[in-house]
Amino acid sequence: MSVYNFKEVESKWQKIWKDNNQYKMDTAQTEKPNYYTLEMFPYPSGKIHMGHVRNYSIGDVVARFKKMEGYNVLHPMGWDSFGLPAENAAIKHGIHPHKWTMENIEEMKEQLNLLGISYDWDKEVATSTPEYYRFTQEIFLKFLEHGLAYKKKSYVNWCPSCETVLANEQVVQGACERCKATVLKKDLEQWYFKTTEFAEELLNDLDTLDGWPEKVKTMQKNWIGKSTGADLVFDIDGTDKSMTVFTTRPDTTYGVTYMVLAPEHELVKELVAGTEYEADVEAFVQKMHTMTEIERTAADVEKEGMFIGRYVINPLNGKKVPLWIANYVLVEYGTGAIMAVPAHDERDRDFAEKYNLDIIDVITEDNKMINSEEFNGLDASEGFEGIIDKLEKEGRGKRTINYRLRDWLVSRQRYWGCPIPVVYCDECGIVPVKKEDLPVLLPTDVEFTGKGESPLTTSKQFMSTTCPHCGKPARREVDTMDTFVDSSWYFLRYVDSNNENEPFSKELVNRWHPVDQYIGGVEHAIMHLLYARWFVKAFKSMGMVDFNEPFKNLLTQGMVLMDGSKMSKSKGNTVSPMDIIDEYGADTARLFVLFAAPPERDLDWSEQGVDGCFRFLNRVYRLVDELADVVKKDVEFGELNSQDKDMRYTIHSTLKKVTADLSEKFGFNTAISALMELINDMYKYKELDNINEAVIKEGVQTIVTIIAPFAPHLGEELWTMIGKEGSVFDIDWPKYDEKALVKDEIEVVVQVNGKVRGKLTVNSNISKDEMEKVALEDEKIKGLVEGKTIVKVVAVPKKLVNIVVK
């Protein structure tokens, strides 16, 4: 008997797949239905980790299974290859980011091929190549043309460690999402994408995503943060200016006793200019710039503020109330101003008590309005509507929907990102680069200092250009785009990755989208998944696509843990996939990550578990090797005895279960478990006397076919061992035989007073009455009920009989 040489087998089949371009998919094909399965593409760090192995193994099982089900399967891979690590490597090691990135891509690509993943490498994209980012730039220009990209000056999140601006989504509890440094505020002119333009669609269309985890949808709903209320206009006393405030409680407007502006609000500087308050206010504003959002707004942080010498007029009763600035009001939320109602808001009350400001109750405990003039006695809900009606008639307010979601800040002061394709002309202002002049290439003559302004400012050749409009000298934009821009449309490019004329063909992307199955970590719930959804809605509004959502179904796989902790280099608890592949083989590594836990749950690494999977694959190999000659025979079932029927039942019930686990849910672990039981039963069956060779043949062929998506190298090898030609993945997925699932005899449980007291083998067509009779006539049961009164007998057809006695 031969030995399973996994190294030889895996090397052999990887070469065959590559030489035959086995997984190339012509996206223009229309003969079969399409199925697009996609794992989130990685940043090319140079080494794959066990999280990658799990993610890509899940996607590969789906891709291979769907191909065998008769679909045209698109299963591409690429690289999210712009980003800070490459730039840091340039600073630290003196190697250009492009060289560092491309070397890492080649290394990771080789590792992915060693895993045996069925990628169509003809569709490969890398976001840092000019072939890709010229179209990222073209998309930017389309957004600019349609008013979805704009530039404005505002206070932004600044990471002093990364020395770049961050989007709101990249700040987690006041810290940089990447490096964990405390995030500060800076007043800068930056580029934005108008994500708020589609806030309502982003929110409402979550309800159409039945194939998404509720957790992810809830996270996005909370991030978008829809609030229904009103914008109220308060005139600033002694000026011709007014300020607008959004409130969800217009019914409390009579309780306003002071107003608060965010220290960074554009009105503050103007209102205190030349007054006795100017110097103190400026000092307070500067102090706020050194504090994080968490430090300013946490419930247990002391409220700080300052009166700025101005009053505003309540639009309902004409009363003047003092205008303050305070740490707990942020310029980026709402209008950057609040109407303070200390009687009915805890933060406002804390502030009012500290600074001795008035507190006026306007809502009673039973929700009735008081101290509210003509609205006294109304329910608060009635007052809500009545007050808005009054203010709308007077032009002092209007019903409004507000969102927590802010526009997406996309400017980054880094080198290794997509250049923003605009120039600045003293005559013409901001001018977009012409489409025919794309891509705007990253220069090579830059200095990587890691300090201050964008490295692009160090390239005079890059900076100096001519205006596309008037031809006079101009300077290029030196910021690059947030790398999340690149990853917000890559799934569309895969379908048409060699198109040199446009980002993608509308006809092709409509044919292949939305992506049928998207797989990646839950950590991308807010940023990547929200941005990708926004891009698709923007594209649809511009006529580039006809669908509303990028991803029909989403699986967020769990992490791979070591002793209950996340694997990380800093903890020294990582396991190298390459070491596992070298010692056990890729199929073993794949099988373990698929078998050890359901895909959406965290998986705890176990050397014993890996070894168990290795031994199982060897058992499969030995079984098929031993029975291969039988499989090659031309045999028929003939007359089947009970043991043959039992074996066929196991074969087809396993096939039914595995098919359901793969097509209806991601039950990889339970499918593999069923396969293991089938192998055990086949080993037992082959040792019996008078075995049926047709049953052996059917069992072995079924095993080879259904193990193939999980362990593709072994599947291919076993397929040839049983005398088959071509690839096992080119055959149709087998269909289970319903007749084989009908048993002549079944086992029923007999209970006495609810406790199991015996099991009986009976005819599968037995009636309820016959079940009761057989149970009562069983010698063991007779002894148990003797001398007792039988109260009742309950039979559950084909399952159990319960005899109640006293």
Curated annotation (Swiss-Prot):
Gene Ontology cellular component annotations, sorted alphabetically: cytosol
Span(s) of short sequence motif 'HIGH' region: 42-52
UniProt GO molecular function: aminoacyl-tRNA deacylase activity; ATP binding; leucine-tRNA ligase activity
A family per Pfam: tRNA-synt_1g
Reactions performed catalytically: tRNA(Leu) + L-leucine + ATP = L-leucyl-tRNA(Leu) + AMP + diphosphate
Short motif 'KMSKS' region, span: 566-570
Enzyme Commission code(s) on record: 6.1.1.4
Record bears the keyword Transmembrane: no
GO biological process: leucyl-tRNA aminoacylation
Matches recorded under InterPro entries: aa-tRNA-synth_I_CS, aa-tRNA-synth_Ia, Leu-tRNA-ligase, Leu_tRNA-synth_edit, M/V/L/I-tRNA-synth_anticd-bd, Methionyl/Leucyl_tRNA_Synth, Rossmann-like_a/b/a_fold, tRNAsynth_Ia_anticodon-bd
PROSITE patterns recorded: AA_TRNA_LIGASE_I
Class of enzymatic activity (EC top level): ligase
Assigned keywords, A-Z: Aminoacyl-tRNA synthetase, ATP-binding, Cytoplasm, Ligase, Nucleotide-binding, Protein biosynthesis
Subcellular location: Cytoplasm
Protein residues bound to ATP: K569
Similarity field: Belongs to the class-I aminoacyl-tRNA synthetase family.
HAMAP family, per database record: Leu_tRNA_synth_B
Name of this protein: Leucine--tRNA ligase
Organism of origin: Clostridioides difficile (strain 630)
Gene that encodes it: leuS
